[in-house]
Amino acid sequence: MSKKLTFQEIILTLQQFWNDQGCMLMQAYDNEKGAGTMSPYTFLRAIGPEPWNAAYVEPSRRPADGRYGENPNRLYQHHQFQVVMKPSPSNIQELYLESLEKLGINPLEHDIRFVEDNWENPSTGSAGLGWEVWLDGMEITQFTYFQQVGGLATGPVTAEVTYGLERLASYIQEVDSIYDIEWADGVKYGEIFIQPEYEHSKYSFEISDQEMLLENFDKFEKEAGRALEEGLVHPAYDYVLKCSHTFNLLDARGAVSVTERAGYIARIRNLARVVAKTFVAERKRLGYPLLDEETRVKLLAEDAE
């Protein structure tokens, strides 16, 4: 029997596969975020006319999902492998199935289903047509064609493939608990992450200073606005991410009511929309450098009319 892939070998296999499909291999973005979609490598690059093909691992923090390291399938922080391709290849689903084969999962021998699950992220004004991918009854991937990002219609269409690495690894390695996943030869997932899981859960649910978090949200929101006034898209978006994570900590702590929750989400969404519009304007001002010359000249001429 062949040796099962370790967690890091799964990552390496996916990186090599999507590299071969023309994706740039980006690194995880250094701000807390709830999903790989919120990385600027997806959120910003999915809008505007320029092509963009990228793949990266993104640690994703969801404070409300923390379970003190006691739940075998639910985590404060999990890892996503994010693929974003714009314009979307016509054979993106076939490429995805081929990537599973590279991981030793033969689609002809397993029950693989694309279950309709249209996606929406209210806090960033983003939505798209989507499917959950179920492997023998377990969700392992989210598949999305973005229709709107930051309140802006997307065009060309961007395809996003988000692998849940822990779920995928637990299936491949045939373990019931995420903490039993072999990260590398002789090193278990739990030996690396179970203590951080406990500590972050304790902090999120019991220890975090609610007043400080409320003040920080206001400060981060204000600073994002100041950066936008200067046309500084990327620093502004960093503060949008900080607002989002701070809100998630407040939400986990039970510090916001249902009414207040909607208000905080709207504040984040309003900032994200301004960031998106400013980014598109910035790329136009720069002359859409990632476009081929013929398309670039044509588009700039149309914009000038």
Curated annotation (Swiss-Prot):
Protein name as it appears in the record: Glycine--tRNA ligase alpha subunit
The record ties this protein, via PANTHER family, to: GLYCINE--TRNA LIGASE, CHLOROPLASTIC_MITOCHONDRIAL 2 (PTHR30075:SF2), GLYCYL-TRNA SYNTHETASE (PTHR30075)
Q: Which InterPro entries does the entry mention?
A: aa-tRNA-synth_II/BPL/LPL (IPR045864), Gly-tRNA-synth_heterodimer (IPR006194), Gly-tRNA_ligase_asu (IPR002310)
Quaternary structure, from the entry: Tetramer of two alpha and two beta subunits.
Natural source organism: Streptococcus pneumoniae serotype 2 (strain D39 / NCTC 7466)
Similarity section? Belongs to the class-II aminoacyl-tRNA synthetase family.
Q: Which reaction does it catalyse?
A: tRNA(Gly) + glycine + ATP = glycyl-tRNA(Gly) + AMP + diphosphate
According to its UniProt record, what is one Pfam family this protein matches?
Answer: tRNA-synt_2e
Q: Which compartments is it annotated to reside in?
A: Cytoplasm
A GO biological-process term:
glycyl-tRNA aminoacylation
What are the disulfide bonds? none
Q: Provide this UniProt record's keywords sorted from A to Z.
A: Aminoacyl-tRNA synthetase, ATP-binding, Cytoplasm, Ligase, Nucleotide-binding, Protein biosynthesis
Q: Which GO terms describe its molecular function?
A: ATP binding; catalytic activity, acting on a protein; glycine-tRNA ligase activity; transferase activity
Main localization is: cytoplasm
Q: Which CDD domains does the record associate with it? A: GlyRS_alpha_core
The enzyme's E.C. designation: 6.1.1.14
Q: Which GO terms describe its cellular component?
A: cytosol
